Amino acid sequence: GLPRPGDVSLAHRGVLFLDEAPEFSAGVLDCLRQPLESGVVTIDRVGGRASYPAAFQLVLAANPCPCGKAGGRGLECTCTSLQRRRYFSRLSGPLLDRVDIQVEVGAVSAADLASTGHGESSVEVARRVLRARRAAERRLAGTPWRLNAEVPGSYLRGPDGGLSAPLSRRLMTALERGDLSLRGVDRVLRLAWTLADLE
């Protein structure tokens, strides 16, 4: 029959969280590239072809190695360097080029868990996000976009994107040296606008 929506399209306008991402096959992970780029997933089957909306935030989580003990406090990792390389090689460069923020999180100790320090409440974070979205909407008024994630790179890099000449030169130098891909330049600009909106 006709292809039916899967997790990617069910995550439309939400978050697709892949825990232990390197445990997924490289083929499955690379299939995420097209919907991340276009916001649409197209499925071809013998019974027909179907396209579904798939504009989602992708969150990937991974252990530091296959056994999960590398970098841990008092834990002995049993993985070889080759095993670690193979483990992370499933997360291809083109896929990671579509991941805006990458963060390494260290092991949590018992003392960290027992700590009574308080961060921001969910309500406070929600208020900050709402203010940032309103700032983006004001800045993007008169354009077809409401969110920084929706703005195409050509606009971000163009005269209306608000990019100063010195910053533009720095980004183009990073692009020419191979430190950033064109997607990476756009990612930096989107993230910069988001951080500015959060201020």
Residue ranges and their predicted role:
Residues 1-16, 49:
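Conserved alpha-helical scaffold flanking the Walker A/P-loop in AAA+ ATPase domains
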